[in-house]
Amino acid sequence: MGRLLRLDRSGHTELAEWTAGDEAAEARAVATFEAELERGLIGSATRDGAAEVVRELPLDADLVILRRPIAGG
């Protein structure tokens, strides 16, 4: 089962959940992920112990996290 989370002021919000083969849930998760990218969020997924930025929802990932870009001065 995969989960799509957005880091926010509450800590995190679960945006989507899907299981392999559930095409409707996968399509909803992809649409949600793409909408959040359009809002300027950055997606990352952890595979093999290393996190990487993703621009497409990896449906084989257990956890994908969306966050705002880090800005500093």
What label would you give each PLM region?
Residues M1-A71:
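Ubiquitin-like/PB1-type beta-grasp interaction modules and other compact soluble beta-rich domains
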